[in-house]
């Protein structure tokens, strides 16, 4: 299995179906890679470690590295979580990249994505079903299905 690049993703868009899976640990990442999953979404949640000890940046960094080591040939997108500023998103994305992530998922506003792009950091986000914004959209439902309504969601 050859690891995808951002360039590959752009070239395959609309032409090739890719598989994507959320993994929580190195065992899942390894199994997913062996199964041929193209893209893995990873995030750091202290409950996924189940260590019973306080977690900090060292644990997060080790978590990303463990998953990268377990799945060296899979495109990894690391979920940044909710951050308080575009600068903090850049800092977190640089740390994720330095620990093995190929891109980051950032669910914040477009100005965060723009800041990441301006720094050359590949970022993924979406408009549509955004669970943490369900109170704004009237529940868990897909929104922005056409260009006009998508632009309203974007605004």
Residue ranges and their predicted role:
Residues 19-23, 103-106:
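Short, hydrophobic beta-strand segments that form beta-sheet elements in well-ordered domains
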Residues 20-22, 39-41, 75-79:
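Short, conserved beta-strand segments within well-ordered enzyme catalytic domains
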Residues 73-77, 83-155:
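Conserved anion-binding
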Residues 1, 24, 55-63, 84-88, ...:
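Short secondary-structure boundary/capping elements
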Residues 2, 19-20, 60-66, 72:
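Metallocofactor- and cofactor-centric catalytic cores in central/energy metabolism, strongly enriched
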Residues 28-67, 101-116:
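Glycine-rich, proline-tolerant flexible connector loops at the mouths of alpha/beta enzymes
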Residues 1-22, 136:
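N-terminal amphipathic alpha-helix/helix-capping segment at the start of soluble metabolic enzymes
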Residues 25, 32, 123:
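Conserved, mostly hydrophobic/aromatic
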């Amino acid at each position: 299995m050859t690891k995808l690049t951002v360039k590959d993703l752009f070239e395959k868009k609309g032409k090739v179906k890719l598989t994507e899976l959320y993994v929580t640990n190195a065992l899942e990442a390894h199994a997913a890679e062996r199964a041929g999953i193209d893209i893995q979404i990873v995030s750091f949640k202290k409950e996924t470690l189940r260590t019973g000890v306080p977690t900090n940046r060292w644990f997060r960094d080790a978590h990303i590295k463990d998953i990268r080591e377990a799945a060296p040939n899979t495109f990894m997108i690391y979920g940044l979580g909710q951050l308080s500023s575009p600068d903090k998103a850049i800092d977190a994305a640089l740390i994720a990249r330095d620990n093995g992530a190929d891109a980051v998922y950032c669910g914040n506003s477009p100005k965060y994505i723009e800041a990441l792009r301006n720094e050359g950091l590949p970022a993924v986000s979406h408009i549509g079903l955004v669970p943490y914004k369900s109170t704004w959209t009237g529940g868990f439902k897909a929104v922005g299905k056409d260009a006009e309504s998508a632009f309203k969601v974007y605004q």
